[in-house]
Swiss-Prot record:
Statement: the UniProt record of this protein carries the keyword Ligase: no
Matches recorded under Gene3D superfamilies: Dihydrodipicolinate Reductase, domain 2 (3.30.360.10), NAD(P)-binding Rossmann-like Domain (3.40.50.720)
Subcellular location: Cytoplasm
Pfam family of the protein (one): Semialdhyde_dhC_1
Originating species: Mesorhizobium japonicum (strain LMG 29417 / CECT 9101 / MAFF 303099) (Mesorhizobium loti (strain MAFF 303099))
Entry-linked InterPro entries: AGPR_type-2, NAD(P)-bd_dom_sf, NAGSA_dehydrogenase, Semialdehyde_DH_NAD-bd
Protein known as: N-acetyl-gamma-glutamyl-phosphate reductase
EC number: 1.2.1.38
Annotated active site: C116
């Protein structure tokens, strides 16, 4: 018997991407609600409970409702919304976050797919906090830019309609209430809420996250090489991971980084830039906001949960 996969919300941006990634998978059976029954709660409940894994690509409240409709103890859930990312009983679906995280996902019945914005900063900050190079109360700011697909269908339609007239750089989240802050704080092991100041660019997908560090106030100031080594050692210990750390020796010669280099993949690349004389560093991560940042991570988590 092939595992049955139900994508609740398969017609949204993330749902469509997941459906496309699974289209050629002969080892799975994708089940879908007939078009005429899509708005029926009873139909959703029927398909949720018929699935081996239900992938929820819904707004937070709708995702919570879907979970409440599941009465089949064998149905596993991957939730792509923010509803359960720091909830008790849910495994966080960033498999490379820790060397035991893939196992935690594989054995979980409930997995919260990460948001696109926190994954890069978690990848760069968590190894530094756990190694003691950065204190948990270090003041953190996250900057970056992503493709407009991160804003969902309304933003996609707006950017496509405007074409070359669309904004090249559009900051948002200016109220300092970004919905991804709680998971970033929790999984980067920070003791205070970081500032998250994202922006959207006039390109469809791909993203760069940037964490600038002013290190001069620390009692023991780490060098760039020490920061890089801690991050590189962290990911070297994770077997089968999809996060690559750029060699430190190459970084002096890199004038720029393209946010679209990993589009269409589930990979991430991490960079550490530093000026030791100024006690400053930049932690960068590049990945596809629709890949490792959303649908690619969901499929990776699904495979772990199925033992594939």
């Amino acid at each position: 018997m092939k595992p049955k996969i139900f994508i609740d919300g398969e017609h949204g941006t993330t749902g469509l991407q997941i459906r496309a990634l699974l289209a050629e998978r002969g080892d799975l059976e994708i089940i879908s609600i007939p078009t005429e029954r899509r708005k029926e709660t009873a139909a959703r409940a029927e398909f949720l409970n018929a699935a081996d894994i239900a992938i929820l690509c819904l707004p937070d409240d709708a995702a919570k409702e879907s979970v409440s409709l599941i009465t089949n103890d064998t149905t596993k859930v991957i939730d792509a919304s923010t509803a359960h990312r720091v909830a008790e009983g849910w495994a966080y679906g960033f498999a490379e976050m820790d060397k035991e995280q893939a196992k935690a996902i594989a054995t979980a019945k409930r997995v919260a797919n990460p948001g696109c914005w926190p994954q890069g900063p978690i990848a760069t900050l968590r190894p530094l906090v756990t190694s003691g190079l950065l204190p948990a109360d270090f003041p953190i700011t996250v900057n970056g830019i992503s493709g407009y697909s991160g804003g969902g269908r309304p933003m996609i339609e707006d950017y496509v309609a405007k074409g070359e007239d669309a904004s090249e750089f559009l900051p948002y989240g200016l109220t300092l209430q970004h919905k991804h802050v709680p998971e970033l704080r929790a999984y980067a092991k920070l003791s205070h809420d970081p500032i998250m100041q994202p922006a959207v660019g006039n390109f469809a997908q791909g993203m760069i996250t940037v964490v600038p560090l002013q290190l001069g106030g620390l009692d023991s100031v780490p060098t760039g090489a020490e920061l890089h080594a801690a991050i590189a050692d962290h990911f070297a210990a994770i077997k089968g991971g999809v996060v690559e750390v750029a060699p430190y020796a190459h970084l002096e010669r890199m004038p720029e980084i393209d946010p679209e280099i990993y589009n269409g993949t589930n990979r991430m690349k991490v960079y550490v830039f530093a000026n030791d004389k100024r006690a400053q560093a930049l932690l960068l991560a590049v990945y596809d906001n629709l890949g490792k940042g959303a649908s690619g991570a969901a499929v990776q988590n699904m495979d772990l949960m199925l033992g594939l």
